[in-house]
Amino acid sequence: MSDRLCLLTVHAHPDDEASKGAGTIARYHAEGVHTVLVTATGGEEGEILNPALDTDEVRANIAAIRRRELDDAAAVIGYDEVVLLGYRDSGMADSPANADPRCFARAPLAEAVGRLVAEIRRARPQVVVTYPDEQRGYRHPDHLRVHEISVAAFEAAGDPAAYPFAGVAHQPQKLYFTVWSIEQIVARHEKFVELGITSPYAEWFADGWPNRMGGLAPTARIDVSEYYEARRGGLLAHATQIDPSSPFWFGLPEDVDRQLYSAEAYVCARNLVGPIGAEDDLFAGIRENVAAPGG
């Protein structure tokens, strides 16, 4: 019997942990679950999206600044640990950064999987959260590679013969993909229209985006209605990446935004404790085999 619940998430860049699943982490952290953030890269290729910080000094020190932002955001959200796998940001597809031998997308797959296996075996989570391979809206090389290494590491971590240098074998019980619910995005777009505010999603809908995004229907919806501030604060901690006046993140009145941000959606990709079905708890089927949350 394990002596604590542990949730490990795998993200590509600093700020991804704030935009994907922050409310879920805040909720489980508040319940006493041990929460671990693994970030693959330092986000060195990220554009400075906050005009107030777009200076020569910030650009020259972007790697160090983004690491500080990551630590600040993780503290606001409720991560107990932050681990960097140590790769360089690969940049967008077909950008010059793709050619850098230090970048994540160019790392040998077995090497990157081994690094993640080591973290899984060290932290010993029951639940791992990562990205799906179906990323039609944002096919960043690092996001696709995160999916690859996460699935492979989930399978390998419990095999003593795989990566024997990476610690004592440990098999997580469930693997989830974090997804943006199309229904929630539609609801947000419609609320912008209803309130007479220009919708940042208008172009998406104009070119048929919802019809191209089908395929992954959420199997789990986690109630995060009490953790709106954690997500908002986590986003704002990434000051170089998040413009506080951004209509995408903050275009709706806060009370309206809070109502629309009531749940976060996931797809269960592996479940070793039972059949995959509708859930409202990522630890469903696991809790009874753990001595005590946070124990």
Q: Which ranges hold each PLM region?
A:
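Active-site rim/loop-helix segments in enzyme catalytic domains that contact anionic ligands
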Residues: 1-124, 255, 267-268, 275-276, ...
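Metal-dependent de-N-acetylase/amidase catalytic core
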Residues: 1-10, 97-98, 102-295
